[in-house]
Protein backbone atom coordinates (compact mmCIF):
# COMPACT_ATOMS: atom_id res chain seq x y z
CA UNK A 1 0.00 0.00 0.00
CA UNK A 2 1.06 3.60 -0.60
CA UNK A 3 2.66 5.14 2.53
CA UNK A 4 2.37 1.91 4.51
CA UNK A 5 4.91 3.04 7.14
CA UNK A 6 3.01 6.28 7.78
CA UNK A 7 -0.29 4.40 7.81
CA UNK A 8 0.96 1.92 10.41
CA UNK A 9 2.24 4.73 12.64
CA UNK A 10 -1.08 6.61 12.44
CA UNK A 11 -3.00 3.38 12.98
CA UNK A 12 -0.92 2.62 16.09
CA UNK A 13 -1.75 6.07 17.48
CA UNK A 14 -5.47 5.39 17.01
CA UNK A 15 -5.14 1.89 18.50
CA UNK A 16 -3.51 3.42 21.57
CA UNK A 17 -6.55 5.67 21.88
CA UNK A 18 -8.94 2.73 21.43
CA UNK A 19 -7.15 0.70 24.15
CA UNK A 20 -7.01 3.50 26.73
CA UNK A 21 -9.37 3.10 29.70
CA UNK A 22 -10.25 6.81 29.84
CA UNK A 23 -10.12 9.63 27.30
CA UNK A 24 -8.82 12.66 29.15
CA UNK A 25 -6.67 15.62 28.12
CA UNK A 26 -3.43 13.69 28.71
CA UNK A 27 -4.59 10.82 26.45
CA UNK A 28 -5.57 13.24 23.67
CA UNK A 29 -2.24 15.08 23.88
CA UNK A 30 -0.34 11.78 23.72
CA UNK A 31 -2.26 10.67 20.60
CA UNK A 32 -1.64 14.08 19.00
CA UNK A 33 2.11 13.76 19.73
CA UNK A 34 2.13 10.30 18.09
CA UNK A 35 0.41 11.76 15.00
CA UNK A 36 2.94 14.62 14.89
CA UNK A 37 5.85 12.17 15.08
CA UNK A 38 4.40 9.95 12.33
CA UNK A 39 3.86 12.88 9.94
CA UNK A 40 7.26 14.49 10.56
CA UNK A 41 8.98 11.12 9.96
CA UNK A 42 7.12 10.99 6.62
CA UNK A 43 8.83 14.31 5.72
CA UNK A 44 5.71 16.43 6.08
CA UNK A 45 6.58 20.10 6.64
CA UNK A 46 6.82 20.80 10.40
CA UNK A 47 4.72 23.99 10.22
CA UNK A 48 1.96 22.14 8.35
CA UNK A 49 2.09 19.30 10.91
CA UNK A 50 1.79 21.69 13.86
CA UNK A 51 -1.16 23.53 12.25
CA UNK A 52 -2.92 20.23 11.54
CA UNK A 53 -2.38 18.70 14.97
CA UNK A 54 -3.43 21.91 16.75
CA UNK A 55 -6.78 21.68 14.94
CA UNK A 56 -7.12 17.99 15.86
CA UNK A 57 -6.29 18.67 19.52
CA UNK A 58 -8.63 21.68 19.77
CA UNK A 59 -11.57 19.78 18.28
CA UNK A 60 -10.87 16.63 20.33
CA UNK A 61 -10.83 18.63 23.58
CA UNK A 62 -13.79 20.90 22.83
CA UNK A 63 -16.30 18.91 20.75
CA UNK A 64 -18.95 16.69 22.29
CA UNK A 65 -19.65 13.49 20.34
CA UNK A 66 -23.15 13.03 18.83
CA UNK A 67 -25.60 10.69 20.55
CA UNK A 68 -24.65 7.05 20.07
CA UNK A 69 -21.02 7.80 19.25
CA UNK A 70 -18.31 7.27 21.87
CA UNK A 71 -15.64 9.88 22.60
CA UNK A 72 -12.98 7.55 21.13
CA UNK A 73 -14.90 7.07 17.89
CA UNK A 74 -15.50 10.80 17.62
CA UNK A 75 -11.78 11.57 17.98
CA UNK A 76 -10.95 9.02 15.26
CA UNK A 77 -13.52 10.77 13.05
CA UNK A 78 -11.86 14.14 13.79
CA UNK A 79 -8.45 12.74 12.78
CA UNK A 80 -9.99 11.34 9.59
CA UNK A 81 -11.71 14.63 8.70
CA UNK A 82 -8.69 16.85 9.40
CA UNK A 83 -6.28 14.61 7.45
CA UNK A 84 -8.73 14.54 4.54
CA UNK A 85 -8.94 18.35 4.57
CA UNK A 86 -5.15 18.47 4.81
CA UNK A 87 -4.81 16.52 1.54
CA UNK A 88 -7.38 18.46 -0.46
CA UNK A 89 -10.84 17.21 0.67
CA UNK A 90 -12.39 16.42 -2.72
CA UNK A 91 -11.39 14.11 -5.58
CA UNK A 92 -10.79 15.99 -8.83
CA UNK A 93 -10.96 13.56 -11.78
CA UNK A 94 -9.62 14.34 -15.26
CA UNK A 95 -12.64 15.30 -17.37
CA UNK A 96 -12.92 13.89 -20.88
CA UNK A 97 -15.38 16.33 -22.48
CA UNK A 98 -14.17 16.57 -26.07
CA UNK A 99 -13.05 14.08 -28.66
CA UNK A 100 -10.12 13.99 -28.80
CA UNK A 101 -9.08 15.28 -25.39
CA UNK A 102 -5.38 16.20 -25.52
CA UNK A 103 -3.29 15.74 -22.36
CA UNK A 104 0.29 17.04 -22.18
CA UNK A 105 2.59 15.52 -19.55
CA UNK A 106 5.72 17.15 -18.16
CA UNK A 107 8.16 16.17 -15.41
CA UNK A 108 11.61 16.71 -13.95
CA UNK A 109 14.23 14.12 -14.98
CA UNK A 110 13.69 10.81 -13.15
CA UNK A 111 10.17 11.63 -11.97
CA UNK A 112 8.68 8.46 -13.48
CA UNK A 113 6.89 10.38 -16.23
CA UNK A 114 7.14 7.83 -19.05
CA UNK A 115 5.93 4.96 -16.85
CA UNK A 116 3.10 7.15 -15.54
CA UNK A 117 1.98 7.95 -19.10
CA UNK A 118 1.75 4.24 -19.90
CA UNK A 119 -0.26 3.69 -16.71
CA UNK A 120 -2.54 6.62 -17.54
CA UNK A 121 -3.15 5.26 -21.05
CA UNK A 122 -4.01 1.84 -19.63
CA UNK A 123 -6.30 3.44 -17.01
CA UNK A 124 -8.36 5.18 -19.71
CA UNK A 125 -8.31 2.16 -22.02
CA UNK A 126 -9.83 -0.01 -19.27
CA UNK A 127 -12.66 2.50 -19.05
CA UNK A 128 -13.54 2.13 -22.71
CA UNK A 129 -11.58 5.02 -24.25
CA UNK A 130 -9.45 4.68 -27.37
CA UNK A 131 -6.04 6.16 -26.46
CA UNK A 132 -3.07 7.28 -28.56
CA UNK A 133 0.37 8.18 -27.16
CA UNK A 134 2.76 10.73 -28.68
CA UNK A 135 6.42 10.48 -27.68
CA UNK A 136 7.97 13.91 -28.20
CA UNK A 137 10.84 13.18 -25.80
CA UNK A 138 13.71 13.78 -28.24
CA UNK A 139 16.26 14.10 -25.46
CA UNK A 140 16.35 10.73 -23.68
CA UNK A 141 17.68 7.79 -25.73
CA UNK A 142 15.23 4.92 -25.71
CA UNK A 143 12.21 6.95 -24.51
CA UNK A 144 10.15 5.97 -27.58
CA UNK A 145 11.10 2.28 -27.27
CA UNK A 146 10.38 2.24 -23.54
CA UNK A 147 6.91 3.69 -24.06
CA UNK A 148 6.18 1.21 -26.87
CA UNK A 149 7.29 -1.76 -24.76
CA UNK A 150 5.06 -0.69 -21.88
CA UNK A 151 1.83 -0.29 -23.87
CA UNK A 152 2.15 -2.56 -26.93
CA UNK A 153 0.90 -5.64 -25.01
CA UNK A 154 -2.39 -3.75 -24.56
CA UNK A 155 -2.74 -2.67 -28.20
CA UNK A 156 -2.10 1.03 -27.50
CA UNK A 157 -0.37 2.85 -30.38
CA UNK A 158 2.64 5.13 -29.82
CA UNK A 159 3.52 7.83 -32.37
CA UNK A 160 7.17 8.87 -32.46
CA UNK A 161 10.40 9.12 -34.44
CA UNK A 162 13.70 8.41 -32.61
CA UNK A 163 15.59 10.28 -35.37
CA UNK A 164 13.61 13.53 -35.07
CA UNK A 165 15.17 16.20 -32.82
CA UNK A 166 12.38 18.80 -32.92
CA UNK A 167 10.07 18.00 -29.99
CA UNK A 168 7.42 20.57 -30.93
CA UNK A 169 7.22 19.27 -34.51
CA UNK A 170 6.82 15.70 -33.21
CA UNK A 171 4.10 16.74 -30.76
CA UNK A 172 2.11 18.55 -33.48
CA UNK A 173 2.45 15.68 -35.98
CA UNK A 174 1.50 13.12 -33.33
CA UNK A 175 -1.63 14.97 -32.27
CA UNK A 176 -2.68 15.38 -35.92
CA UNK A 177 -2.00 11.67 -36.59
CA UNK A 178 -4.33 10.56 -33.79
CA UNK A 179 -6.98 13.19 -34.64
CA UNK A 180 -7.25 11.59 -38.07
CA UNK A 181 -7.51 8.14 -36.47
CA UNK A 182 -10.44 9.30 -34.33
CA UNK A 183 -9.08 8.38 -30.90
CA UNK A 184 -10.78 9.66 -27.73
CA UNK A 185 -7.68 10.68 -25.76
CA UNK A 186 -4.22 11.77 -26.93
CA UNK A 187 -1.46 11.78 -24.29
CA UNK A 188 1.72 13.66 -25.24
CA UNK A 189 5.01 12.79 -23.52
CA UNK A 190 7.42 15.75 -23.40
CA UNK A 191 11.20 15.73 -22.87
CA UNK A 192 12.53 14.44 -19.57
CA UNK A 193 15.75 16.41 -19.59
CA UNK A 194 14.99 19.16 -17.10
CA UNK A 195 16.60 19.17 -13.69
CA UNK A 196 14.72 22.22 -12.36
CA UNK A 197 11.32 23.87 -12.69
CA UNK A 198 12.22 26.93 -14.76
CA UNK A 199 13.34 25.17 -17.96
CA UNK A 200 10.58 22.56 -17.63
CA UNK A 201 7.90 25.26 -17.50
CA UNK A 202 9.43 27.07 -20.46
CA UNK A 203 9.18 23.94 -22.60
CA UNK A 204 5.67 23.26 -21.31
CA UNK A 205 4.58 26.70 -22.51
CA UNK A 206 6.14 26.17 -25.97
CA UNK A 207 4.50 22.76 -26.53
CA UNK A 208 1.19 24.00 -25.07
CA UNK A 209 1.15 26.88 -27.57
CA UNK A 210 1.70 24.39 -30.41
CA UNK A 211 -0.79 21.62 -29.50
CA UNK A 212 -3.27 23.50 -27.23
CA UNK A 213 -3.87 20.69 -24.70
CA UNK A 214 -7.07 20.49 -22.65
CA UNK A 215 -5.00 19.68 -19.57
CA UNK A 216 -1.31 19.73 -18.62
CA UNK A 217 -0.17 17.07 -16.14
CA UNK A 218 2.96 17.47 -14.01
CA UNK A 219 4.46 14.17 -12.83
CA UNK A 220 6.16 14.57 -9.43
CA UNK A 221 8.46 12.00 -7.83
CA UNK A 222 7.01 11.14 -4.40
CA UNK A 223 10.47 10.31 -3.03
CA UNK A 224 11.50 14.00 -3.01
CA UNK A 225 9.20 14.69 -0.06
CA UNK A 226 8.38 18.28 0.83
CA UNK A 227 10.65 19.57 -1.95
CA UNK A 228 7.64 18.85 -4.18
CA UNK A 229 6.16 22.14 -2.93
CA UNK A 230 8.38 24.33 -5.15
CA UNK A 231 7.70 22.24 -8.27
CA UNK A 232 3.95 22.18 -7.71
CA UNK A 233 3.74 25.89 -6.89
CA UNK A 234 5.77 27.01 -9.94
CA UNK A 235 3.64 24.73 -12.12
CA UNK A 236 0.33 25.95 -10.67
CA UNK A 237 1.33 29.57 -11.25
CA UNK A 238 2.36 28.84 -14.85
CA UNK A 239 -0.82 27.15 -16.12
CA UNK A 240 -4.52 27.41 -15.23
CA UNK A 241 -5.25 23.92 -16.64
CA UNK A 242 -2.66 21.99 -14.65
CA UNK A 243 -3.04 18.82 -12.60
CA UNK A 244 -0.58 16.52 -10.87
CA UNK A 245 0.38 12.85 -10.63
CA UNK A 246 2.52 11.91 -7.61
CA UNK A 247 4.54 8.75 -8.32
CA UNK A 248 6.48 6.13 -6.32
CA UNK A 249 4.29 6.30 -3.23
CA UNK A 250 4.54 2.54 -2.68
CA UNK A 251 8.16 2.47 -1.51
CA UNK A 252 8.93 5.98 -0.29
CA UNK A 253 9.27 7.09 3.32
CA UNK A 254 8.81 10.68 2.10
CA UNK A 255 5.58 10.19 0.15
CA UNK A 256 3.47 11.87 2.83
CA UNK A 257 5.69 14.93 2.57
CA UNK A 258 5.26 15.07 -1.21
CA UNK A 259 1.47 14.64 -1.10
CA UNK A 260 0.96 17.23 1.63
CA UNK A 261 3.36 19.70 -0.02
CA UNK A 262 1.47 19.51 -3.32
CA UNK A 263 -1.90 19.79 -1.55
CA UNK A 264 -0.62 22.90 0.29
CA UNK A 265 -0.15 24.69 -3.06
CA UNK A 266 -3.76 24.07 -4.05
CA UNK A 267 -2.67 22.30 -7.26
CA UNK A 268 -5.10 19.42 -7.91
CA UNK A 269 -3.63 15.91 -7.46
CA UNK A 270 -5.47 13.70 -9.98
CA UNK A 271 -3.59 10.39 -9.67
CA UNK A 272 -1.04 8.62 -7.48
CA UNK A 273 1.40 5.87 -8.48
CA UNK A 274 1.19 3.01 -5.97
CA UNK A 275 3.32 0.24 -7.51
CA UNK A 276 5.33 -0.97 -10.47
CA UNK A 277 2.56 -2.77 -12.38
CA UNK A 278 0.92 -0.92 -15.27
CA UNK A 279 -2.39 -1.04 -13.37
CA UNK A 280 -0.85 0.56 -10.26
CA UNK A 281 -2.20 4.06 -10.84
CA UNK A 282 -5.09 5.28 -8.69
CA UNK A 283 -7.31 8.32 -9.02
CA UNK A 284 -6.52 10.39 -5.93
CA UNK A 285 -9.48 10.77 -3.61
CA UNK A 286 -8.42 12.29 -0.25
CA UNK A 287 -11.38 10.75 1.63
CA UNK A 288 -10.75 7.24 0.40
CA UNK A 289 -6.97 7.59 0.65
CA UNK A 290 -7.04 8.75 4.30
CA UNK A 291 -9.61 6.09 5.16
CA UNK A 292 -7.23 3.37 3.94
CA UNK A 293 -4.24 5.09 5.51
CA UNK A 294 -5.91 4.94 8.94
CA UNK A 295 -6.95 1.30 8.50
CA UNK A 296 -10.63 2.25 8.10
CA UNK A 297 -10.95 0.65 4.65
CA UNK A 298 -12.08 1.87 1.24
CA UNK A 299 -15.33 0.15 0.39
CA UNK A 300 -15.89 2.14 -2.81
CA UNK A 301 -12.43 1.19 -4.06
CA UNK A 302 -13.06 -2.46 -3.21
CA UNK A 303 -16.35 -2.48 -5.12
CA UNK A 304 -14.73 -0.84 -8.14
CA UNK A 305 -12.02 -3.51 -8.22
CA UNK A 306 -14.61 -6.28 -8.08
CA UNK A 307 -16.67 -4.57 -10.80
CA UNK A 308 -13.60 -4.63 -13.05
CA UNK A 309 -13.16 -8.33 -12.35
CA UNK A 310 -16.82 -8.95 -13.14
CA UNK A 311 -16.41 -7.14 -16.48
CA UNK A 312 -13.64 -9.60 -17.27
CA UNK A 313 -16.18 -12.37 -16.42
CA UNK A 314 -13.78 -13.86 -13.93
CA UNK A 315 -15.54 -12.94 -10.72
CA UNK A 316 -19.23 -13.44 -9.96
CA UNK A 317 -21.15 -11.88 -7.07
CA UNK A 318 -21.91 -15.27 -5.50
CA UNK A 319 -18.19 -16.14 -5.66
CA UNK A 320 -17.32 -12.95 -3.80
CA UNK A 321 -19.95 -13.59 -1.13
CA UNK A 322 -18.67 -17.13 -0.58
CA UNK A 323 -15.10 -15.83 -0.32
CA UNK A 324 -15.89 -13.05 2.18
CA UNK A 325 -17.93 -15.39 4.40
CA UNK A 326 -15.03 -17.85 4.57
CA UNK A 327 -17.15 -20.55 2.88
CA UNK A 328 -14.79 -21.32 0.03
CA UNK A 329 -12.83 -24.42 -0.90
CA UNK A 330 -9.42 -24.88 -2.55
CA UNK A 331 -10.94 -24.67 -6.01
CA UNK A 332 -12.58 -21.33 -5.18
CA UNK A 333 -9.45 -20.03 -3.49
CA UNK A 334 -7.28 -20.56 -6.52
CA UNK A 335 -9.80 -19.13 -9.00
CA UNK A 336 -10.36 -15.99 -6.94
CA UNK A 337 -6.72 -15.39 -6.04
CA UNK A 338 -5.78 -15.69 -9.70
CA UNK A 339 -8.47 -13.18 -10.65
CA UNK A 340 -7.62 -10.80 -7.81
CA UNK A 341 -3.96 -10.90 -8.73
CA UNK A 342 -4.83 -9.03 -11.92
CA UNK A 343 -6.22 -6.17 -9.83
CA UNK A 344 -3.29 -5.99 -7.40
CA UNK A 345 -1.89 -7.89 -4.43
CA UNK A 346 -4.46 -9.54 -2.16
CA UNK A 347 -3.14 -7.54 0.80
CA UNK A 348 -3.90 -4.29 -1.05
CA UNK A 349 -7.46 -5.46 -1.63
CA UNK A 350 -8.03 -6.64 1.93
CA UNK A 351 -6.77 -3.30 3.26
CA UNK A 352 -9.85 -1.77 1.65
CA UNK A 353 -12.04 -3.63 4.15
CA UNK A 354 -12.68 -1.56 7.31
CA UNK A 355 -10.98 -3.04 10.35
CA UNK A 356 -8.60 -5.26 8.41
CA UNK A 357 -5.99 -2.56 7.72
CA UNK A 358 -2.64 -3.18 9.34
CA UNK A 359 -3.72 -6.09 11.53
CA UNK A 360 -3.42 -8.51 8.62
CA UNK A 361 -0.69 -11.13 9.04
CA UNK A 362 1.53 -10.80 5.99
CA UNK A 363 1.91 -14.59 5.67
CA UNK A 364 -1.84 -15.00 5.33
CA UNK A 365 -2.14 -12.69 2.35
CA UNK A 366 1.18 -12.37 0.53
CA UNK A 367 0.72 -15.03 -2.07
CA UNK A 368 3.29 -14.17 -4.72
CA UNK A 369 3.14 -15.24 -8.34
CA UNK A 370 5.71 -18.00 -7.89
CA UNK A 371 3.85 -19.51 -4.97
CA UNK A 372 0.60 -19.30 -6.91
CA UNK A 373 2.15 -21.22 -9.79
CA UNK A 374 3.35 -23.89 -7.35
CA UNK A 375 -0.06 -24.00 -5.67
CA UNK A 376 -1.70 -24.61 -9.06
CA UNK A 377 0.68 -27.48 -9.81
CA UNK A 378 -0.16 -28.99 -6.41
CA UNK A 379 -3.91 -28.53 -6.93
CA UNK A 380 -3.67 -30.07 -10.39
CA UNK A 381 -2.58 -33.28 -8.64
CA UNK A 382 -5.62 -33.33 -6.36
CA UNK A 383 -8.86 -35.14 -7.03
CA UNK A 384 -12.10 -33.21 -7.53
CA UNK A 385 -13.25 -34.45 -4.11
CA UNK A 386 -10.06 -33.12 -2.44
CA UNK A 387 -10.43 -29.72 -4.09
CA UNK A 388 -14.03 -29.42 -2.97
CA UNK A 389 -13.49 -30.90 0.51
CA UNK A 390 -9.90 -30.09 1.61
CA UNK A 391 -10.66 -31.35 5.13
CA UNK A 392 -10.39 -34.97 3.88
CA UNK A 393 -6.73 -34.50 2.91
CA UNK A 394 -4.79 -36.66 5.38
CA UNK A 395 -1.08 -37.59 5.51
CA UNK A 396 -1.29 -40.40 2.92
CA UNK A 397 -3.14 -38.09 0.50
CA UNK A 398 -0.53 -35.36 1.10
CA UNK A 399 2.24 -37.84 0.20
CA UNK A 400 0.41 -38.84 -3.00
CA UNK A 401 -0.25 -35.20 -3.99
CA UNK A 402 3.41 -34.25 -3.38
CA UNK A 403 4.62 -37.20 -5.46
CA UNK A 404 2.20 -36.44 -8.30
CA UNK A 405 3.02 -32.73 -8.42
CA UNK A 406 6.80 -33.06 -8.09
CA UNK A 407 6.74 -30.99 -4.90
CA UNK A 408 7.52 -31.75 -1.27
CA UNK A 409 5.22 -32.78 1.57
CA UNK A 410 6.13 -29.47 3.21
CA UNK A 411 4.94 -27.49 0.16
CA UNK A 412 1.60 -29.32 0.08
CA UNK A 413 1.19 -28.59 3.80
CA UNK A 414 2.08 -24.94 3.12
CA UNK A 415 -0.77 -24.69 0.61
CA UNK A 416 -3.22 -26.23 3.09
CA UNK A 417 -1.95 -23.94 5.86
CA UNK A 418 -2.40 -20.89 3.61
CA UNK A 419 -5.94 -21.99 2.78
CA UNK A 420 -6.87 -22.54 6.45
CA UNK A 421 -5.34 -19.20 7.48
CA UNK A 422 -7.41 -17.35 4.89
CA UNK A 423 -10.63 -19.12 5.89
CA UNK A 424 -9.95 -18.36 9.54
CA UNK A 425 -9.18 -14.72 8.80
CA UNK A 426 -12.38 -14.13 6.83
CA UNK A 427 -14.55 -15.98 9.35
CA UNK A 428 -13.16 -13.88 12.21
CA UNK A 429 -14.21 -10.61 10.58
CA UNK A 430 -16.95 -8.98 12.67
CA UNK A 431 -19.36 -7.90 9.92
CA UNK A 432 -21.75 -5.94 12.17
CA UNK A 433 -18.95 -4.00 13.83
CA UNK A 434 -17.37 -3.16 10.47
CA UNK A 435 -20.73 -2.06 9.04
CA UNK A 436 -21.36 0.19 12.05
CA UNK A 437 -17.89 1.74 11.70
CA UNK A 438 -18.42 2.33 7.97
CA UNK A 439 -21.71 4.15 8.60
CA UNK A 440 -20.16 6.40 11.22
CA UNK A 441 -17.43 7.45 8.84
CA UNK A 442 -19.83 7.95 5.92
CA UNK A 443 -17.88 5.28 4.06
CA UNK A 444 -20.98 3.61 2.69
CA UNK A 445 -22.50 0.20 3.34
CA UNK A 446 -20.80 -2.86 2.01
CA UNK A 447 -23.31 -5.66 2.05
CA UNK A 448 -21.19 -8.25 3.85
Curated annotation (Swiss-Prot):
Residues involved in GTP binding: 107-114, 189-193, 247-250
EC number: 3.6.5.4
InterPro entries for the chain: AAA+_ATPase, P-loop_NTPase, Signal_recog_part_SRP54_M_sf, Signal_recog_particl_SRP54_hlx, Signal_recog_particle_SRP54_M, SRP/SRP_N, SRP54, SRP54_GTPase_dom
CDD domains tied to this protein: SRP54_G
One Gene Ontology term of the molecular function aspect: GTP binding
HAMAP family: SRP54
Function: Involved in targeting and insertion of nascent membrane proteins into the cytoplasmic membrane. Binds to the hydrophobic signal sequence of the ribosome-nascent chain (RNC) as it emerges from the ribosomes. The SRP-RNC complex is then targeted to the cytoplasmic membrane where it interacts with the SRP receptor FtsY.
Family as reported in the entry's similarity comment: Belongs to the GTP-binding SRP family. SRP54 subfamily.
This protein's name: Signal recognition particle 54 kDa protein
Species per Swiss-Prot/TrEMBL record: Thermococcus onnurineus (strain NA1)
Encoding gene per record: srp54
Amino acid sequence: MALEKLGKALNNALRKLARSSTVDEATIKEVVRDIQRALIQADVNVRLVLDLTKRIEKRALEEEPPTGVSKKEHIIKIVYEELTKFLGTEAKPIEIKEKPTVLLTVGIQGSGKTTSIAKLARYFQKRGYKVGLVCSDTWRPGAYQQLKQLVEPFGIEVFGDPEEKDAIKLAKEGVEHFREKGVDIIIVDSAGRHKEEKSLIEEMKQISAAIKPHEVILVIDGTIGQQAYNQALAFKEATPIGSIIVTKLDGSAKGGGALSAVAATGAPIKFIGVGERIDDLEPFDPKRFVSRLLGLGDIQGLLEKFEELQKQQEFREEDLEKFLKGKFNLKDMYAQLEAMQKMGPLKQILQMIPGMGYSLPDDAVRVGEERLKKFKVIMDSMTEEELEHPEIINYSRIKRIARGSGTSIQEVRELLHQYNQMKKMFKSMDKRKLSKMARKFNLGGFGL
